[in-house]
């Protein structure tokens, strides 16, 4: 049996024991955050479904760019009284930014997040910087995983379990120190068909955002003319 990625094993254990895992995967753009999240999901599907190979698991990997789409999916699970092993919010800061804390949907999502474990064993967020996410999500991110290159030439990245230690200086002042523990090494590469579908879906969301930006700018121009 193939070895699972570290985070995948945590999720499998949570799924089988009615537990819950929350993870924020972050790092510079282009280092393989999304790839790591997808490969974790692949390993989870492979293990839970008892598949022969990990390649078979790619067809079951699910992810979301938008909160409304994800909530529709969770509502369907609730209506059917089902529970799934994970849900992935890719580029989570688009909808779940700390700058949107005052919006009604964020307040409602904050309330529901305490109950989400009933339907999902793990919530995975990807973002360039964890500080961009709403505080209540960062606070509840049990695992913060930083992704960096191990060998850019060979397209090998490493996932580091990120933690902050608190200490006191000789003068009694509090200081923080970041620690990083390597948990996984992986190839930043996805199957062609899966990657093509991901790029297509991502492009659709990019165009939607650009349309929203243009609409906002046009409204501003109209106000300036009045």
Label every PLM stretch briefly.
Residues 36:
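Hydrophobic positions on the alpha1 helix immediately C-terminal to the Walker A/P-loop
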Residues 61-123:
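Conserved nucleotide-sensing/catalytic segment adjacent to the nucleotide-binding pocket
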């Amino acid at each position: 049996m193939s070895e699972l990625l570290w985070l995948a094993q945590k999720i499998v254990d949570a799924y089988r024991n009615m537990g819950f895992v929350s993870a924020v995967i972050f790092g510079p753009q282009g280092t393989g955050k999304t790839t790591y999240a997808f490969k974790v999901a692949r390993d989870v599907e492979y293990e839970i479904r008892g598949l022969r190979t990990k390649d078979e698991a790619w067809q079951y990997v699910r992810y979301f760019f938008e909160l409304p789409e994800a909530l529709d999916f969770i509502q369907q699970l609730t209506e059917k009284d089902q529970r799934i092993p994970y849900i992935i919010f890719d580029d989570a800061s688009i909808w779940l930014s700390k700058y949107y804390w005052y919006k009604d949907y964020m307040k409602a999502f904050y309330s529901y997040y305490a109950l989400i474990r009933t339907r999902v064993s793990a919530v995975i967020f990807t973002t360039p910087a964890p500080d961009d996410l709403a505080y209540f999500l960062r606070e509840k991110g049990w695992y913060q995983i930083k992704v960096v290159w191990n060998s850019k030439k060979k397209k090998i990245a490493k996932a580091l379990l990120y933690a902050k230690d608190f200490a006191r200086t000789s003068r009694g002042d509090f200081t923080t120190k970041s620690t990083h523990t390597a948990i996984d090494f992986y190839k930043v590469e996805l199957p062609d068909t899966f990657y093509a579908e991901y790029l297509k879906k991502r492009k659709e969301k990019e165009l939607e955002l650009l349309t929203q930006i243009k609409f906002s700018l046009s409204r501003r121009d109209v106000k300036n003319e009045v």
